[in-house]
Design a protein with these regions (language model features):
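Conserved N-terminal entry element of GNAT/NAT acetyltransferase domains
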Residues: 3-26
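Residue-level signal for beta-strand positions within conserved beta-sheet cores that form or flank
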Residues: 16-19, 94, 130, 167
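Residue-level signal for short amphipathic helical patches enriched in basic/charged
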Residues: 26, 127, 135
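C-terminal "cap" of GNAT-fold acetyltransferases
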Residues: 130-133, 137-175
Length: 175
């Protein structure tokens, strides 16, 4: 019985190192790969989405711009999710777009996405945004359900000029 008990206790005491932090330059290749893997996993369009967007390879540089932020979930020193805000061209100055919200398969169903969303919404308040806009794809149905639960309302047409022409789900939330 002792070896079994020891094994059980050892498994129960596994340390998981999960931190939430802002994007770092070293994250660029990991996040770009993760985002493209999610697009492929869900068989989402590659054209007209972040998949072919060159900024996906340079997220640290993109989010170094003022009035933007990209939160990263880091699990055991590996980025497993991200979610950010960006002042997308064509949006009013009191609007930001919720962008680059992706989770690797390792991060799903653990509350990591919800925490990334909370941190991003708190950042929206700190940056004095009044509205958060987002674009998505119908294949991301669980994400869309989470957006609705968080108070996002569906729109009939896009806002701003994200350049992501394949995204045909548009939503808005008052901060």
């Amino acid at each position: 019985r002792l070896p079994f008990l020891f094994s059980y206790l050892s498994l129960k005491n596994i340390v998981v190192n999960l931190i939430y932090r802002k994007v770092k330059s070293k994250d660029n290749p990991f996040l770009a790969t993760m985002i493209r893997n999610v697009i492929e996993e869900f068989d989402a369009p590659r054209t007209g989405t972040v998949y072919e967007d060159s900024s996906t390879d340079h997220l640290f540089e993109l989010f170094s711009k003022s009035n933007s932020v990209l939160w990263v979930a880091d699990l055991n020193n590996e980025p497993v999710g991200c979610c950010g805000l960006y002042p997308t061209a064509g949006l009013a100055s009191n609007y930001a777009e919720l962008v680059k919200f992706y989770l690797s398969h390792k991060a799903r169903g653990k509350g990591i996405g919800k925490e990334l969303m909370i941190r991003t919404m708190n950042s929206a308040k700190e940056l004095n945004y009044e509205y958060i806009y987002l674009e998505s794809l119908p294949g991301f149905s669980k994400a869309i359900s989470m957006y609705k639960e968080s108070g996002f309302k569906q729109l009939d047409s896009p806002l701003g000029n994200s350049g992501h022409s394949s995204c045909d789900v548009w939503m808005l939330k008052k901060v």
